[in-house]
Amino acid sequence: MVLAKVKVKFSQILSKSREVNLLSAARMFLFGSRDIWFVVGLPVFLSASLGWSHAEVGGFLALWVIGYGGVQALAPKLLDRCLGGGTPRGGTATLGAFVLAILTGLIALGVGLDLSPWVTVVCGLALFGLVFALNSSVHSYLILAYTESEQAALNVG
């Protein structure tokens, strides 16, 4: 393991770029939402509400991760189609966050209206996962686009 020769002060971690700092804050909430849904909420729901066994929940989540990876791998092509060949901009990430918020609200509405829990939660979160994977790719692209080359490792990390 290689250790850094110079320790970075906390104040140096924040970028001088407003765009990088805003995107970093957005990424914190983006990944926090993913963890709440997929690390806590979905496994508990599948087990407690649908009566799935530990093995069924684990198998489902394993398939979920594989599917998420597939969407991530296809994200450049999907985004290229959605953007008509253009490159993602800050507004693209904002739109993705808005769609994620709408999907979350629709899932809550579906549960509140006593619609089928399986359809409402699992299918709703499948759409959430698809949009999340695309938005995560946009964030990854933007952080590199906004970063000066000598600060890339610090900003991406």
Predicted segment positions?
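Conserved extracellular-gate-facing transmembrane-helix segments in secondary transporters
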Residues: L30-L42
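Transmembrane alpha-helical segments of major facilitator superfamily
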Residues: G59-Y68, F128
